[in-house]
């Protein structure tokens, strides 16, 4: 089963993306290199609580 999580930009903290994550991996926080429209560049996006 999967759970929806929100990804937020590390630099400006805007929440730009949603992703699905397996419930078994709840201890690990998801990180991805995505484009932030607020910063207008690719930045690291981290899973928010």
UniProtKB/Swiss-Prot annotation:
GO terms for molecular function: structural constituent of ribosome. One of its GO terms (cellular component) is ribonucleoprotein complex. Keywords: Ribonucleoprotein, Ribosomal protein. One of its GO terms (biological process) is translation. The keyword Ribonucleoprotein applies. Pfam families: Ribosomal_L33. InterPro entries: Ribosomal_bL33 (IPR001705), Ribosomal_bL33_sf (IPR038584), Ribosomal_zn-bd (IPR011332). HAMAP family: Ribosomal_bL33 (MF_00294). Belongs to the bacterial ribosomal protein bL33 family. This is Large ribosomal subunit protein bL33A.
């Amino acid at each position: 089963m999967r759970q929806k999580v929100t990804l937020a930009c590390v630099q400006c903290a805007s929440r730009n993306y949603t992703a699905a994550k397996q419930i078994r991996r709840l201890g690990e926080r998801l990180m991805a290199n995505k484009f932030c429209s607020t910063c207008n560049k690719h930045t690291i996006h981290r899973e928010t609580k």
